[in-house]
Amino acid sequence: MADSLKMGNLSLNESQHAPAAPPSNGRAAYIPPHLRQRTMGANVDGAAASPPGPAPGAGAWNGPRNAPRGGNWANANASDFSPRGPNVPNGNISWTPTETQRRPFNPHAYGHPGHGGSYGGSHGSAKGSGDGQWRDGKHIPGPANARLERELFGVPNDPTKQSTGINFANYDDIPVEASGHDVPEPVNAFTNPPLDDHLISNIKLARYQTPTPVQKYSIPIVMNGRDLMACAQTGSGKTGGFLFPILSQAFQTGPSPVPAQASGQFGYGRQRKAYPTSLILAPTRELVSQIFDEARKFAYRSWVRPCVVYGGADIGSQLRQIERGCDLLVATPGRLVDLIERGRISLVNIKYLVLDEADRMLDMGFEPQIRRIVEGEDMPNVNERQTLMFSATFPRDIQMLARDFLKDYVFLSVGRVGSTSENITQKVEYVEDHDKRSVLLDILHTHGTSGLTLIFVETKRMADALSDFLLNQRFPATAIHGDRTQRERERALEMFRSGRCPILVATAVAARGLDIPNVTHVINYDLPTDIDDYVHRIGRTGRAGNTGIATAFFNRSNRGVVRELIDLLKEAHQEVPSFLESIAREGSGYGGRGGRGGRGRGGNATRDMRRMGGNVGGGGPSFGGGYGAPSGSSYGGGAGGYGAPPAYGGGYGGGYGGGSYGNPSGPTGPSSWW
């Protein structure tokens, strides 16, 4: 019965995602020769079997390719529109026939991976990476692949690949504060030195012309061997800030030797245990997938092979991609602990440890897993590796924990971190709950179809209900939340990115870290109870110097964040509605929490605690309350430490469960908290 269900979900496009590495069920993936030729022709010659959707900014939701282009949403219910149904061809899959050819084992490159899809179980195949070699102490890049370059880097003016926006030049005016001794001077261009020539060529392919402020400082800091804690505005290039120097040094120094105790583990050109030299940890599967895509891009034609592992996807396919070679590993903490327990990953060779969205990982209860990975396994100690922490906010307690992970670090604060970008026009509307749908329709009709619209709600049920409502109103919408399967989430994101479905209703899963080009409007249908979450939600627009609009529906049920919301609006020079100020004056008892567990953003969320003379060793103030009554835990009492709460009670989409946050091997089983 299970086989028949799996067969029912197969499509021609899915079978193309891994031509070089057939899945475990060979019968399900078999394609007759005549269909292979037809499929290849559709991709090569452009005669796709099903019509693609319009690019972002197109005038309408289009039907068949030869249908007239309209200027409205009239075709939202066209026969090929199925944002929540199974097996929607995305029209963007490219298949390189030569990738299926068998290649001899290359001891310098660990073998050649199969072709992975955009996301999902075969996501980590890293096609194009690992094609280079390290021979006689030199990096020899692999051959160019025009088709793969188009897939990774797009073409000029490709709406799905965003580099810079109209306000990018204004980034030079953003203040930068670097603290620590002997801070290296910033760089103003992608040049050699300090960067490797091959990395610079890939940066040019991505059409990046000038480093962002965080990149100007992080590149020389990391290249000089220093640890780094970096705070920067969301959308300011943090991913490149750690990938560029890590990959550059990898290209210059080559791979690390496999430990002697690993001898005998090799067979047929593979090894059962991977020994990555770089580890990047991030809280969500979507974020690690995005970082992996960037790593593939900038490791193109190099000897470095990136891999990605996360919960919710088939662990068998992830194990197979690791066996083919893993030099740079992007992972969620839960799945990484699982693979370490299985004896499939060793951290003994780690040179670089990156904690991306570090505050969110600790906030969501990943601290025990992170401490086990960093301190309880075979990872080199803090003095034998470089550790980089990147996020948009670093509250005081997070900085106190950083003392255990970093040594003699440089603290980098770029701009008004923890606040919002002035590239975003913020609007706050007073809307009662029963009026939200009608106001939303008015906004969507007013702003038309240009760009992408991201709508945030608090619960999974609301996400589905609102997307169904918009579909009934002839607006092409889809939803993403934790109750949807991994493939459904991947398909929804792909359709949204490509503009085929330009409205996405999301829970907190997409609130932080995801870099989706051309999001021109973010709507907080349900305001979060935490002002930091609001900052990161609206940060999905106005990225890389582009402009965007953020609209928030506010009523008295949101008065807990009114004071911080007013402060944010003033900081970003936005209009403050009079009703916000009147509600804020109603009583001091409503003052916002300011942050999770009452910690507060305060005035020091972006300041280096080492310069403030504070006691960072315990004995600090109590961070009372914890994360909700059900857990029975609180932050620290008077000792200033984490209480490792086992549950988080209520919040995004029906509660945080047992603290597994996207970790199917955690206490919640196959479900994730969002």
From Swiss-Prot:
Residues 57-68, 662-674 have a biased composition (Low complexity). It is found in: Cytoplasm. InterPro entries: DEAD/DEAH_box_helicase_dom, Ded1/Dbp1_DEADc, Helicase_ATP-bd, Helicase_C-like, P-loop_NTPase, RNA-helicase_DEAD-box_CS, RNA_helicase_DEAD_Q_motif. CDD domains: DEADc_DDX3_DDX4 (cd17967), SF2_C_DEAD (cd18787). Keywords: ATP-binding, Cytoplasm, Helicase, Hydrolase, Initiation factor, Nucleotide-binding, Protein biosynthesis, RNA-binding. Residues 45-143, 585-617, 653-674 are annotated as: Disordered. Its main location: cytoplasm. It is an enzyme of class 3 (hydrolase). Residues 89-99 have a biased composition (Polar residues). Residues 113-131, 588-603 have a biased composition (Gly residues). ATP-binding RNA helicase involved in translation initiation. Remodels RNA in response to ADP and ATP concentrations by facilitating disruption, but also formation of RNA duplexes. PANTHER family: ATP-DEPENDENT RNA HELICASE DBP3. The Q motif is unique to and characteristic of the DEAD box family of RNA helicases and controls ATP binding and hydrolysis. This is ATP-dependent RNA helicase ded1.
